Amino acid sequence: MSETQKENPYSSTVLLPKTDFPMKADLAKREPAQIQSWKSGQIFRKMKEQRKGKKEFVLHDGPPYANGNFHLGHSLNKIVKDIIIKSKSLAGFYADMIPGWDCHGLPIEVQVLKNLGKKARETGPEELRRLCRNYAEEFVGKQGEDLSRFLCFWEEDRIYKTMSPGFEAKIVEVFGELFQKGYVYRGKKPVYWSIDLATAHAEAEIEYYPHVSPSIYVKFPIVGEQKKFCLIWTTTPWTLPANLGICFNRKIEYSFFKTESGEELILADGLAESVTSTTGVSLNKVKSISSDELSVLKFQHPFMDRISISLFGDHVTLDAGTGCVHTAPGHGQDDYKVGLAAGLEPFSPVDDYGKYTDEFPLMQGKKVFDANPEIIQLLKDKGLLLHHSEFEHSYPHSWRSKKPLIFRATPQWFFKMDFNELREKSLSAIDGVQWIPSWGITRIRSMVETRPDWCLSRQRNWGVPIPAFTCESCGQTHIDDVSIQFFTKMVREKGIEIWYSEKAADLLPPGTKCGKCGSDSFKKGNDILDVWFDSGVSSFAVLGERKDEPPADLYFEGSDQHRGWFQSSLWPSMALRGIPPYKTVLTHGYVLDEKGHPMSKSLGNGIDPTADVIQIYGADILRLWVSSLDFRDDIKVGKESLKIVSEQYRKIRNTFRYLLGNLDGHTSEQNLPFEELEELDLFYLSKLSQFAEDVIANYEAYQFHQIYQKLILFCTVTLSQDYFDMIRDRMYCDARNSKTRKSSATALQYILETLCILTAPILSFTAEEVWVSNGKKDSVFLQNFPDLKFWKNQNLEEKFESVLQVREVVQKALEIARQENKLGKSLEAGLEIVSKNGTNLTKILPKETLEILFVVSQVHEKNPGLDVLSFYENEKFSVKVLKPVQVECPRCWRHTEDISKEGDLCGRCKSVVG
């Protein structure tokens, strides 16, 4: 208010907004107390108990690794899950989510070894496992604190950890059931192998980075021929010692090509020009050679006393190389398959640490990548190297060590993808799952269609042991249903440490004998299960079973989980249940910096959700930021974008504050019945109904960014700019118990309660604070989304909207008058409004209502001779701003005809003041 009004003798009679709800949020300071209030009041538990017997909605939480603090991506993931659970609960569902943590595996073991430093070499396996368990427990606690701070609702005594004895036992049990049904086998196949970590890797543990490899063209001499060779191309010279054949494609045409030196080379016709371009060697076609002729050829290995045979496979293409593919069944998936068909055993003269064994004595003990230059020199010395250059390409690396991987054949435990038509059944089931975004189905289908058998075993310390034994007499592997069940019971009681603390005989049922030789002497295996198998069986360990339908309604994780958790969860569920574990799969993109780069400590571009957001702005700002994102795509974020969201929050908070202030002295019990409400208030309740309907639909579709946009628009335009402006006069100047004021107060009460409930899943702290400030005793989370369809009034909306389209023209006309210093407050103005199509606005709404809508003192169909202050028109209406002849009421500032002289009150204000 102006200084003039402060001195106004009537200022104390004006009902200005009054509330203890602070304009300054101070969220960072206030929120912890609210968290304690929710915990002590057991609100989450009550929320679920209140909805027992209602339709169930289960969101299965994908477990993050228990290492390191939560980053912004974790925050996004967990907050979206929290929004979903709360919105489903408010929609009437029995909604539940049990937070979980992935506690075994390489990420934790490697970090513990790193922390040990030089002491790592002195640390035994038992002590290492103890340290890993302690480390995981520590970060479950730390991440749990983060979770409480921004997630709000979860029960700390109701979580799952993959290292708990019950969960570990379920892992062994599911492995046993899969083994019993024939899905698990032991075999020697090429797998991704980390020579730095000395263990196999699953496809989900692989990252691709640019890598420079040697590109060489090698001549394999044809046995029994002079100066005739088969030309192969490879970027892995180190695999040549394991070469057992050369692979062709029967659909490709091959020929002998003569070089300038007189040598003849076999290669694909379609690649001759490319080879010449790359190598600079001129090639002249001599004659074609058929597939039958190729099949009988044998080739001398370039530097081993061994013959390589002809093979055929559809994986050979004309995309690159020579069309003649160097084949080492021990070092490649396609190589293994064609070799298996030809009866070739996978041969890999490389040990766990990537060093050649005595099977390649020439370079025994040398690391394979270090051997590349020596092998190239060896080929050059023998005159079998046609060309050598460097080749940059995308190459698989370990997700943990960030070092290049190799393909290496080792004895491993595998899950059969094609047993019992599992792949076909899984693809069919995928079609029945709802994938959001829709492209998710294409991504996972392509991966499931081509995925090789899943390598389940790892050669590390920290994980669930595979309960397999080896007969000490004959070397036969022993594992069966009885032994697995026996061991499962032991794990359930004492955890996986029992595998290491007990002798083999004590881990097997009494009387166990080798099925091959009858011996009762066994030794324990050293393999542990892939950590992806741990999380993959979480639907069995954590969720209840439902008859003939998936146990989870929703999985929500990053889009990288199409090749990770979504698959590792799918396979066991399809094999044992015959259905997928989820009905719907929703994914989010990566959180990137403002320039689209991944966030990292080394780049210094990260945003810490606790230090940079919660401790400065509060958790509700972080939650509002998450809701503002279309998280289905990658998300760019910087500190500036958080400031913008903070500003938008301030507008929302001020809307709540204005509502509370105007409701001072008015409670829900004082609301007027529907039939007594003013048309203007009914119109905005109709708009509230549509707003609520849209928001609830957006929650249902997980389109929270649209809720954010609608909320900002509703608060800043529909309410603050329009409705609050229109009813300010009656709320401030009408008698407290007047029908018009109570009508608007009733509408404001409905708006406040509805906004509180609708925003609670996102602005959880603020919504609860407002709810309590409005005198409510129970939590906002014990309410339901309101059904406001009865407020919907299409006829009333059409009626008001037809008039409100003039409001924009009026405001522009008023602004012109202000800019020309002819007008201060809009109440100092009268209006002449002329419709160019002949519409008479006073026939649609009473003149008094039009004055309220336009926030002016008078509205005329025709200027009664008043001075014109400004003029504005569009194609439908023309508006003149007029200067009223009446003086201003000193209390309400309106210029009305019932004021006799300056300083007198208008009739309405006289009756109020008395």
Curated annotation (Swiss-Prot):
Chain positions recorded as ATP binding sites: K601
Principal place of residence: cytoplasm
Catalytic activity: tRNA(Ile) + L-isoleucine + ATP = L-isoleucyl-tRNA(Ile) + AMP + diphosphate
Localisation per UniProt entry: Cytoplasm
Taxonomic lineage of the native organism: Bacteria, Pseudomonadati, Spirochaetota, Spirochaetia, Leptospirales
CC per GO annotation: cytosol
GO process annotations (BP): isoleucyl-tRNA aminoacylation
PANTHER family membership: ISOLEUCINE--TRNA LIGASE, MITOCHONDRIAL, SOLEUCYL-TRNA SYNTHETASE
Primary role: Catalyzes the attachment of isoleucine to tRNA(Ile). As IleRS can inadvertently accommodate and process structurally similar amino acids such as valine, to avoid such errors it has two additional distinct tRNA(Ile)-dependent editing activities. One activity is designated as 'pretransfer' editing and involves the hydrolysis of activated Val-AMP. The other activity is designated 'posttransfer' editing and involves deacylation of mischarged Val-tRNA(Ile).
InterPro entries according to UniProt: aa-tRNA-synth_I_CS, aa-tRNA-synth_Ia, Anticodon_Ile_BEm, Ile-tRNA-ligase, Ile-tRNA-ligase_type1, Ile-tRNA_ligase, M/V/L/I-tRNA-synth_anticd-bd, Rossmann-like_a/b/a_fold
Motif range ('HIGH' region): 64-74
Gene: ileS
The organism of origin for this protein: Leptospira interrogans serogroup Icterohaemorrhagiae serovar copenhageni (strain Fiocruz L1-130)
Cofactor note as given: Binds 1 zinc ion per subunit.
Residues noted as binding Zn(2+) in the record, renumbered to the chain: C889, C892, C906, C909
Record family assignment: Belongs to the class-I aminoacyl-tRNA synthetase family. IleS type 1 subfamily.
Positions of L-isoleucyl-5'-AMP binding: E557
Subunit structure, interactors included: Monomer.
Cofactor annotation: Zn(2+)
Top-level enzyme category: ligase
Keyword tags: Aminoacyl-tRNA synthetase, ATP-binding, Cytoplasm, Ligase, Metal-binding, Nucleotide-binding, Protein biosynthesis, Zinc
One MF term in the entry's GO annotations: ATP binding
Motif 'KMSKS' region boundaries: 598-602
Description of its domains: IleRS has two distinct active sites: one for aminoacylation and one for editing. The misactivated valine is translocated from the active site to the editing site, which sterically excludes the correctly activated isoleucine. The single editing site contains two valyl binding pockets, one specific for each substrate (Val-AMP or Val-tRNA(Ile)).
CDD domains (alphabetical): Anticodon_Ia_Ile_BEm, IleRS_core
Name of this chain's protein: Isoleucine--tRNA ligase
Any one Pfam family match given in the protein's UniProt record, by short name: Anticodon_1
